[in-house]
A protein has these predicted regions:
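Non-catalytic, conserved peripheral segments adjacent to functional cores
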Residues: 1-58, 74-76, 83, 88-140, ...
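Short alpha-helical functional segments enriched in proximate histidine and acidic residues
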Residues: 69
Length: 144
């Protein structure tokens, strides 16, 4: 369970342990975000943000090659994740959730944000060398 103001991300796993995720909020309300980090992608650095609540029952799919993050907008929130690969700490990576160049509206003031020490150390997108490469062929995996 996470409380109001908790922000996590923007996380991904490097190949060969890359993950796709299907997420939903089973209690509370969150803004959930995916950022395209595939080199060469026409949407590189762009994001999609979705409001997930226990009332709207929406799910959000984050494919491999996208960084994932969220902010809790209710008193508390509980997530449910489905992943297509196991967690591998040695493959853990991230982009700064505070990178203003991404233009993400997190729905709360940064003074209210509660970040883990780990999440304050991720590089900004401009300083990041992505391990993912965009492949425009249908059905192709988007990684090196």
């Amino acid at each position: 369970m996470s409380k109001y103001g908790v922000m996590r991300g923007l996380h991904f796993q490097r190949p060969p342990y890359a993950q796709s995720k299907l997420v939903r909020c089973v209690k509370g309300k969150v803004i959930d975000v995916a950022v395209d980090i595939r080199k060469g992608s026409p949407t590189y650095g762009q994001h999609v943000a979705v409001l997930l609540t226990e009332e709207n029952h929406r799910q959000f799919f984050i494919p491999q090659g996208f960084a994932h993050g969220f902010a809790v907008l209710s008193e508390s929130a509980v997530f449910q994740y489905k992943c297509d690969n196991f967690y591998h700490p040695e493959a853990d990576g991230g982009i700064s959730i505070l990178d203003e160049s991404l233009g993400i509206d997190w729905g709360l003031a940064m003074e209210e944000a509660l970040l883990s020490e780990k999440d304050t150390k991720h590089p900004k997108l401009a300083e990041f060398d992505s391990p993912f490469v965009w492949n425009q062929e249908p059905g192709a995996k988007n990684q090196d």
